[in-house]
A protein has these predicted regions:
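Ribonuclease/tRNase effector modules and their secretory precursors
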Residues: 1-89
């Protein structure tokens, strides 16, 4: 599933930072390693990806105005999610 992103809405950056995730890591996963994207609930997308440093992230986002990604949350993948992600690649 392809999602085209022009810009990011970081209004929840403090929440994301609580998970120890940096904005550049989220951007990398969404822009460069977005081959595994699932449709979530309430018009959201779940993106599974690996940062350029090998960190496995799970990102939830919503698309606003057609091409702006509002990052709702981001965290490290659980062990089970990593296994699922690896089996689907």
């Amino acid at each position: 599933m392809g999602i085209n992103i022009r810009d990011f809405d970081w209004s929840r950056i403090s929440h994301i930072a609580e998970h120890g995730i940096e904005d550049y890591e989220v951007e990398y996963v969404i822009l460069f390693d977005k081959e595994f994207v699932l449709r979530g609930r309430n018009e959201t997308y779940c993106v599974f990806g690996v940062t350029e440093n090998g960190r496995y992230l799970f990102v939830v986002l919503a698309i606003k105005n057609g091409d702006v990604a509002k990052i709702i949350t981001a965290r490290d993948m659980t062990k089970k999610e990593r296994q699922y992600y690896s089996s689907r690649r």
